[in-house]
């Protein structure tokens, strides 16, 4: 049994802020994560730049991200890139049929400089063990 208590950050598209999708993803993450999970839309004030969000991410143990229509928006892309630079594990939450699954993010690909909602893609791989799960 895992006795460690973690701090996580839920990065997601602004297009799903205050929607049922955001609520379902957040509840799934909370119910499976052994620790406190920060949702910037619910727990942080709105900042004009990405820097305050990145400063917060520096303090977390894990970053969880979701794609919107197969892409990362610029904010989520920058949050993931920063977490990876800081050696903070990043996991993507993917919908496979009726199930939600975690995969480890191993790389990011910037696909646009101008479309802020289809800014990047991620490369992920399946994992056998998830150290942050509630048991």
Where are these regions (language model features)?
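Conserved catalytic or regulatory cores that recognize and/or transform ribose-phosphate-containing ligands
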Residues: 1-135
């Amino acid at each position: 049994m895992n006795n460690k208590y973690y701090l996580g950050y839920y990065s997601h598209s602004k297009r799903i802020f205050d929607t049922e999708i955001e609520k379902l993803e957040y509840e799934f993450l909370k119910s499976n994560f052994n620790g406190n999970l920060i949702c910037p839309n619910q727990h942080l004030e709105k900042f004009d730049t990405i820097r305050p969000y990145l400063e917060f991410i520096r303090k977390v143990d894990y970053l969880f991200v979701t794609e919107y229509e197969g892409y990362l928006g610029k904010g989520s892309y920058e949050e993931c890139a920063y977490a990876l630079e800081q050696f903070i594990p990043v996991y993507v939450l993917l919908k496979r049929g009726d199930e939600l699954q975690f995969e480890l993010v191993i790389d990011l690909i910037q696909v646009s400089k101008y479309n802020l909602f289809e800014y990047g893609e991620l490369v992920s791989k399946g994992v056998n063990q998830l150290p942050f799960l509630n048991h």
